[in-house]
Amino acid sequence: MAAILLPQRFRGEAPVTEKTTPSWASKRLTPIAQFLSRLACSHPIHTVVVVAVLASTSYVGLLQESLFNTDVESATLGKADWSTLVEGSRVLRAGPETAWNWKAVEQDVVADAGSDADHLALLTLVFPDSLSAESSSTAPRSHHVPIPQNLSITSLPSTENPFTAYSQDSILAYALPYSEGPEFLAAAQEIPNEDAVEIETKHGREKKTWIMKAAKVNTRNSVVQWVSNAWSEFLDLLKNAETLDIVIMLLGYIAMHLTFVSLFLSMRKMGSKFWLGICTLFSSVFAFLFGLVVTTKLGVPISVILLSEGLPFLVVTIGFEKNIVLTRAVMSHAIEHRRIQAQNSKSGKRSPERSTQNMIQYAVQAAIKEKGFEIIRDYAIEIVILVIGAASGVQGGLQQFCFLAAWTLFFDFILLFTFYTAILSIKLEINRIKRHVDMRMALEDDGVSRRVAENVAKGDDELNRVRGDAPLFGRKSSSIPKFKVLMILGFIFVNIVNICSIPFRNPSSMSTIRTWASSLGGVIAPLSVDPFKVASNGLDAILATAKSNNRPTLVTVLTPIKYELEYPSIHYALGSAASNPAYNDAFHHHFQGYGVGGRMVGGILKSLEDPVLSKWIVIALALSVALNGYLFNVARWGIKDPNVPEHNIDRNELARAQQFNDTGSATLPLGEYVPPTPMRTQPSTPAITDDEAEGLHMTKARPANLPNRSNEELEKLLSEKRVREMTDEEVISLSMRGKIPGYALEKTLGDFTRAVKIRRSIIARNKATTDITHSLDRSKLPYENYNWERVFGACCENVIGYMPLPVGVAGPLVIDGQSYFIPMATTEGVLVASASRGCKAINSGGGAITVLTADGMTRGPCVAFETLERAGAAKLWLDSEAGQDMMKKAFNSTSRFARLQSMKTALAGTNLYIRFKTTTGDAMGMNMISKGVEHALSVMANDGGFDDMQIISVSGNYCTDKKAAALNWIDGRGKGVVAEAIIPGEVVRSVLKSDVDSLVELNVAKNLIGSAMAGSVGGFNAHAANIVAAIFLATGQDPAQVVESANCITIMKNLNGALQISVSMPSLEVGTLGGGTILEPQGAMLDILGVRGSHPTNPGDNARRLARIIGAAVLAGELSLCSALAAGHLVRAHMQHNRSAAPSRSTTPAPPMTPVSLAMTSAQERSASTTSMSAAAIQRSKR
């Protein structure tokens, strides 16, 4: 119970528990967070803009009103006056009551001290860099300091600190009555320098003197000067700080930066390399600004020193765990929503909860429902602890810092569920556009036309989008840069407006704020000094004098006074030039003639003189440049692999699925009634081409019963691009007369289905083939109710219909711990049933294990040279490191996905064959790699010094594509996969109706020896091509590549009484993007395997997963067929499943003969029949 009160970051990883009923507090608080996030997600851009405007106004207000006041009153702070020095002083008392030891007392005790104690002021004058050997100046001696005759001043021994050796400062210390301090300070603002040389300046002849730094006039606050002052103040802090404090602060800042690094690493794991981490920091900074504004408005004093000391520990303690937890939950639910939406779209079902919410809304709401209460609870616990600290009464800045931190956490809570959830919404929408663009570009790289690629990508968007889910930016990649440019310009505009409005704000209205600012405890007030570090030797001398006089003494140790060696005419003044009325009059008079615009320009120029304002503007411009650079490089993201199973395999579910797909079961087991699945609405047909957008309002075709127009009228309509108004017969007439090319019917008509119908009639009436094609237009080859839009320009030309092919599913098959149904398109009976039997046996042994051994598509061009010498030089260059680098660079520049792995060269006379091997993402990649090869060869000829090279063919059969070749068997092509399963002996006997030894012997005799006798290349298997071809047809792969993809060797072993079977396929050529996979039926089959399209995080993973699935399916097919051969069931199974009658016995009288079959007797039967063997055979068997 106590652990629940700790914030999540201190509780570690919570154990996985079952879902519990939400508590009362969760039911009350979670809806509040969901309401805030719902508003932010509904209007993310508005939310980001409003928060950015408020944050910009807040920090500009803080800069003007608190930190960098330029009016007369604030100009006096930090100047050479006594009151400013006293603010950072410390008072010590020594006397008999303190046993003559120094004891710190409060300022209010000084007034009550009375006349029984001497009150002294101890001043320390610091002359920087005067001890350095390279310095041309030396510090003044104590008697050179101008001291009025009426003052009683005592010189004291100076005190060095640990940093004196680094800073090379000279120090003078003085003690004088406290009442005489202001007069001495006024007299010591300028100290002569005896070593200075008098020179001529524009103010006359003068020489450098030591000028009190606090009395110096800054005529121009340059950035360099600001940095120099900041460094000097930092060194002063180090001089007055304890060593332990320095170490603690250093560790605190290191830990804070490690927290930042941890934030970016965590966001990187969730797919955001930079921007989610930056937005998290922005959210926290905005919360800090809002908290600082509220804290200062309530009159709580906050100093810069306090912030610098406390912020690192606040960042380390609170961290960014809440943002990380929320981000992880949102991204995970977004992927879950996409997967479930895809499943519902395929089945026609719709989740009632998700039907009214788009993906972004659902992901955010589900994440807050899951993690919202934990986040709110952590915020509440942390705020309560800080409130206790603010009310504790502990001095030293703890109260003020806790007060500020509590308000910061409160605003961080508000911004987490508003600003940050809006950022997450925008991120999810950018990811959607990225998926759309990546899929389109991958299809274009694979040779698909832009129109078809855009339609396929758009279809994928629609699959994952519910009705009414409008895109935030649109579907164009250019929408993202436009949005970001507008956001950046808007943010810069707000800052410019805020800065420009500063000169127009009424100074008198700030008087109350000035009064409040003076009570701020000194946002710019000096830090209290450590008296013993500043003047320990001087205190010892004063204490010795007090003891000798036996008189109590009060000593006020003032802040060290720093000097600079400068010309008096430039740096010494009675007042600040910024506060000088003459200066202001001259400044405003210069712009007075320009009216309001002049005052605005003057205000801007004056504001830009402030080093911090100019620094913020430079940072804003740098961020703008960085953001614009990011517009064209949105990082990929990913939370979890969709191919990873979400739960362990349920044996009962697996058994029921196997029984449903088992051919031995004639009926289904009775159970609960399941309503029929409604059909998903198909895309409307006809579809319209992109260049015929006006076809959405197509004119109806002319009724067929009207008389045909004349040829002149038809040709006029054709020239006016009004072909769609013609009847089918008129279009046929024009086409048969050669006026409309057959390939252009779809584009001309703007109606794909009508174009296919007319083409059928044209082919049926073609005189050259009419004798055999006359029935085509009335044939049973279907052509209607098909989405021809995806076929046109991508898959097939001169379309006359589509060929329905039966598709069955084998399985389920457990592959690498996940169950799959294997889709197979085939007309061969028993094939699916046989594969299902193999799946059942493999599942009984724990499933199949697969290993991916290679991934690289190849293309082997042929180039020729005039002489063998040149051909050999080209081969040596290609094999060298320089040649490899140049060719890789050229090849990789042609695609975002194709990456050249290696090149293998072979020389045949003067012909040089180069085998390029590359990865191609999730596409099979033949077109992608061909484009890369062309460009690489061009670079080789032009830049590699082989301009005499002649390209014979981009494909020189050295690939080798769609042909049996030993090269593919040895070096591989596409994906290399090895699948293995171990089948218990009992399963072999009960399911496969055979035994382990018989299967092993059959495999050796048939698949190994038999294939070797036939001189096979890669054909050491029973029927791998059967399974590969069926899956290829079902999933939209290239059927011609079955030739090399079916290369397989099947190996079986007896492993401790169990059957160990494996298949090795070194040249499996598959893809999940492009080609036939863009067709909806084939895409649906990839959907049931979970590998459709490109992988969201790792391009190529889907294609590799499909290769593993095919390898495991081939394993099941090999196991089942070999078992049927070993048991003699092959012919009987074909006869049963093909519904063919068994052959009758011949009526010819003949002795009964053993039928010729493929059955094999078992080893035991063969050993039992040795009595019938000849003596020679028996003798050979004993050897």
Curated annotation (Swiss-Prot):
NADP(+) binds at residues 895-897, 922-930, 1138-1139. Residues 1136-1183 are annotated as: Disordered. Residues 267-273, 321-378, 424-482 are lumenal. One of its GO terms (molecular function) is hydroxymethylglutaryl-CoA reductase (NADPH) activity. GO terms for cellular component: endoplasmic reticulum membrane; peroxisomal membrane. InterPro entries: HMG-CoA_N_dom, HMG_CoA_Rdtase, HMG_CoA_Rdtase_cat_sf, HMG_CoA_Rdtase_CS, HMG_CoA_Rdtase_eu_arc, HMG_CoA_Rdtase_N, HMG_CoA_Rdtase_NAD(P)-bd_sf, HMG_CoA_Rdtase_sub-bd_dom_sf. Residues 245-426 form the SSD domain. It comes from the Eukaryota. Residues 1139-1148, 1167-1177 have a biased composition (Low complexity). Residues 1-245, 295-299, 400-402, 504-1183 are cytoplasmic. Its EC number is 1.1.1.34. Gene3D superfamilies: 3-hydroxy-3-methylglutaryl-coenzyme A Reductase, Chain A, domain 2, HMGR, N-terminal domain, Hydroxymethylglutaryl-CoA reductase, class I/II, NAD/NADP-binding domain. HMG-CoA reductase; part of the first module of ergosterol biosynthesis pathway that includes the early steps of the pathway, conserved across all eukaryotes, and which results in the formation of mevalonate from acetyl-coenzyme A (acetyl-CoA). In this module, the cytosolic acetyl-CoA acetyltransferase catalyzes the formation of acetoacetyl-CoA. The hydroxymethylglutaryl-CoA synthase then condenses acetyl-CoA with acetoacetyl-CoA to form HMG-CoA. The rate-limiting step of the early module is the reduction to mevalonate by the 3-hydroxy-3-methylglutaryl-coenzyme A (HMG-CoA) reductase HMGR. This is 3-hydroxy-3-methylglutaryl-coenzyme A reductase. The lineage of its organism: Eukaryota, Fungi, Dikarya, Ascomycota, Pezizomycotina. The gene is HMGR.
